[in-house]
Amino acid sequence: MKLTSEKLPKNPFYASISQYAAKNQKSFQWEKEKTDHYSHANLVDKALQLLKKRILKGDTLAYFLRGQLYFEEGWYEEALEQFEEIEEKDHQATYQLGVMYYDGLGTILNSEKGVDYMKKILDSPCPKARHLKFAAAYNLGRAYYEGKGVKRSNEEAERLWLFAADNGNPKASVKAQSMLGLYYSTKEPKELEKAFYWHSEACGNGNLESQGALGLMYLYGQGIRQDTEAALHCLREAAERGNVYAQGNLVEYYYKMKFFTKCVAFSKRIADYDEVHDIPMIAQVTDCLPEFISRGMAMASFYHARCLQLGLGITRDEATAKHYYSKACRLNPALADELRSLLIRQRI
C-alpha cells in the first residue's frame, strides 16, 4: 500500500502568507486594494512581487514563503531551489526538502536523502523545529513501513507513529493516528480494538479516512459492538465530506437492503468518476489514500453494473452493465473478483 506524506504543519507564528501579510501591513499595502476581481494567477504574481521586496530587505521568512508558494502551485523545481538555499536557516524548508526528495517532487526520487532530512528535524534541539517533529516522525514511520530509504521494519514504523500520534493530541500528527488505525486492522494478527481506538481519535480530530473506517467497524462489529445506526451516521457524513470509499460502501449497503433506486442514483455518480484524473485530484483534496478511493469507485461500478444487468431500479441495459463491470475490474481486480465470487454463490 502506497502511503502519502504528512503536509507541512502550520507555523505557530504564521500559518499562511495572508496571516504573514496581516502582520506586515506597511509592506503589504495591496491588502487594502479590492482583489475580488483578481484571477488566481494575478494574486500569485502579486504575492511573488511583494515577497521579493521583503527578501531584498533580508526577511528570511519571506524567502521560505516564496518557496512554499511555489510548492503549493506545483512548481516543484523552483520550490526545491528556494528551500535548498535556506535549509540551514529554516527548519520548515528542511522538512519540505525531506518530503520532496522522498516523493520525488521537483527532483529525482531519493528516499535516503528524504529520510535524512526528516531525521534532522526529529533530532533537532531547536525550539523552532518543535512543531514539525510529530509530522517528521509520521514520515519516518512511513519510510520504515514501506522500506524505502531505510530497512523495512513494522516495529519501528509503529514506534514512530505512536510518538507522532501523541495519545490522540489534536496538535500532533492526525495522519499518524489514522495510520495506526489502518495498521492495527491489517497487521497479522489483527488488533481491532486498538484499530478502533485510533480511528476514533483521528476521526475526533477531523480525519476523513478514519471517519469512513469507523463506519465500517461499526457496521461489521469489528473492534466494537455492531451498531448499524452509528455506522450509517459515520458513513453518510464521511461520504458527504468526499470519502469515496465510504460512498462505495453505502452503495453496497443500499443494494443489500434492496433500496435499488437509491443505489442506482448514488452508484452512477461515483462510478462515473474519471479513473485517471479524478483519483489524484480527490486524494489531494480529501487526503484519503488513492487505493481506497479506487476501491470505492470499483464497488460503486460493480453494483451499478449489477443493477443495470438485472434492471433493478433502472431500465435493464446489459451493454452498459458490461462497461461498468469492466471498469470495476480495471480499478480493483481483486475486489471485482471477490464480488464476482459472491455473485456466483448467489450472495449478491
Curated annotation (Swiss-Prot):
Q: What Pfam families would the database entry show?
A: Sel1
Q: Which PROSITE patterns match?
A: TPR, TPR_REGION
Is Cytoplasm set as a keyword in this record? yes
Q: Does the keyword Cytoplasm apply?
A: yes
Listed InterPro entries: LRP2-binding, Sel1-like, TPR-like_helical_dom_sf, TPR_rpt
Gene Ontology CC terms, in alphabetical order: cytoplasm
TPR repeat ranges are 60-93
The listed locations are: Cytoplasm
Question: Which of UniProt's keywords are assigned here?
Answer: Cytoplasm, Repeat, TPR repeat
Q: Which SUPFAM superfamilies match?
A: HCP-like (SSF81901)
Principal localization reads: cytoplasm
User: What is this protein's function?
Assistant: May act as an adapter that regulates LRP2 function.
Subunit structure and binding partners = Interacts with LRP2.
Name of the protein in its database record: LRP2-binding protein
List the source organism: Macaca fascicularis (Crab-eating macaque)
